[in-house]
Amino acid sequence: NGLQNQSVLYRKDKAGKEEIFLDPNTFSKDGTTSLGGLNFSKDGSLVAYAISEGGSDWRKVIVMEAKTKKIIGDTIVDVKFSGVSWYKNDGFYYSSYDKPVGSELSAKTDQHKLYYHKLNTAQKTDKLVFGGDVKRRYVGGGVSEDEKYLFISAANSTSGNELYYLDLSKPDAKIVTLIDNYENDNDVLDNKGSKIYLVTNYKAPNKRVVTFDLSNPAKENWKDCIAETENVLSPNTGSGYIFASYMKDAVSFIKQYDYNGKLVRDIQLPGVGTAGGFGGKEKETTLYFSFTNYVTPGTIYTFDPKTGKSAIYQKPKVDFNSADYESKQVFYTSKDGTKVPMIITYKKGTKLNGKNPTILYGYGGFNVSLTPAFSIANAVWLENGGVYAVANLRGGGEYGKKWHDAGTQLKKQNVFDDFIAAAEYLIKENYTS
């Protein structure tokens, strides 16, 4: 409600009745314990959610019956940089480092390990599935929707990862290597039996979806399902389709494909901004997506994958009239001649007289893309006559790997040059002084 320390998670039944599902404000007396993520078992009967105490990266994973909200006692501690992936209703995979001794800030983070926790057993008996032999900072595992395979990703940085798999249908199966280097980003999107759909930036800086069979995983056997384009690809799956989310100049557009790579449709979004979602199980007939921009509060829509039609499902009640404001995207020139996008938002009728108080925001690091999103704090700023500008600096992920690399290491100065040039543009165009 804007006054609480933590956001509250609700659920809604088919009749539209809402109830609180998880309220992180009740996790601690001082409100500093937050919800760090949650994952449901395949049938939705169980949920594992992570909590972070006092902002720590070390988390606890708590298991709860979804229907009754009864905690069942399988609390896992000392978990860090981890998701949770269920295998049937029997247990789940998670990742962590060795338990820290003394100060948690000094704990080593070069031996990330993947474990399997079987429900109703002690954590100390959890099986080590992968890791511990070679220094790896980030290890994660995900169970395929058909629950036949466990796919394992291992990395030493935020770019590039190894890839492995384990056949869960065979009790004595060994982990098999698919990719043994960190040269590219490789993420399993889905599988149809032994046919794998992989998202990769191998020979495709903006990413593509390729297919191959587990019996012939070598790169020379990869075939394009969704080829690389000039825009960065971020795909999802649901209802038996692949939804290719692209970012063009930091804003979203979505294409729907079948599993043969045939275009079904370009999805009509509510406007220019940021869309996310379109994910779900293959059996689902209705999918959901969110949409927001700098003047539109995040709204959830339903989507019919057969017709392409969408409708508002949940719209927040915010005392803010979006129609009174506008966002304008410009492209300014940085020190070395590179064109950099920036979105400037302000109240309609604002005079460009160089006297407007202005917030200029940028990031330019870690492959993070700054896409349009609504903020109450920014809304208050706009209501009071302020200008809000977001520059998409190099070092981010707005234009893929090349854009990211252009703001790292020996090229880090480009990030600062881009930010300075953004400020100079705002002054030159009389937004501020």
Residue ranges and their predicted role:
Residues 1-270, 276-286, 292-298, 302-307, ...:
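Beta-propeller folds
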Residues 147, 276-433:
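Serine-hydrolase catalytic core recognition
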